[in-house]
Amino acid sequence: MKIKLLTLIAVLAMSLGTAWAAGPSSALQPPAGHRMALVVFEDLECPACATADPTLVQAVRDYGVALVRHDFVIPNHPWSKEAHIMARYFDKVNPQLGEEFRQYIFANQQQIFKANLRQWADRFAGAHRTALPAFYDPDGSLRAKVEADTVVGRNLNVHLTPTIWVVTNSPQVPPVEITERAKLFETIEHVKAQLPAEKASAEKKTHRK
């Protein structure tokens, strides 16, 4: 038990150290090979995040931007952190599976409670011909990643969810925070117009940081 606790502390310290070392500005960059991205800090139990999610998915589809999701757990949400840890587990199985799990949780959010979260997760896993182990985070490393992501958000002064930025790989085009969700597509087009022409267009993907 003592060894397991020490291991968990070490993993958490390493994850938090990585988050602090990277600095908040590194989170506001698109993944390698992409010119633009939507960076979102979200909580899986947040109703506003659930409302915004289809719009983010549509933006990825329509504009070819990457979507970088960050965990930002709201402390008074009883099942949110565990759902984020589950999502991290599915990321390990397949990044697309993790993405689909997040969309699934958002789509069914109003029916999910702390007591039935596991049932919903098992239902998702079964529908995708996989299984969620009884102990899906035995060493605490996934929990540490979720908590480290939340630290990154705090360092960026994230106070509410979802917090969304349109970011680019150009130093001349600074990140733009979306304050009115209705203007997301308009903002993407405006930011895209500021980028210099490039030979290859970005591939449509969802990414984890």
Residue ranges and their predicted role:
Residues 1-5:
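Positively charged n-region of N-terminal signal peptides that target proteins for export
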Residues 7-17:
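Bacterial N-terminal signal peptides
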Residues 22-36:
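A short beta-strand-turn-helix
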Residues 31-33, 60-62, 79, 155-160:
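Extracellular/periplasmic catalytic domains that process cell-envelope and extracellular macromolecules
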Residues 32-46, 67:
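Short active-site neighborhood of thiol/selenol oxidoreductases, capturing the structured segment around
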Residues 42, 53, 71, 168-170, ...:
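A mature extracytoplasmic/lumenal domain signature
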Residues 44, 50-125:
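Structural alpha/beta surface segment adjacent to cysteine/selenocysteine redox centers
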Residues 122-209:
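C-terminal cap of thioredoxin/glutaredoxin-like
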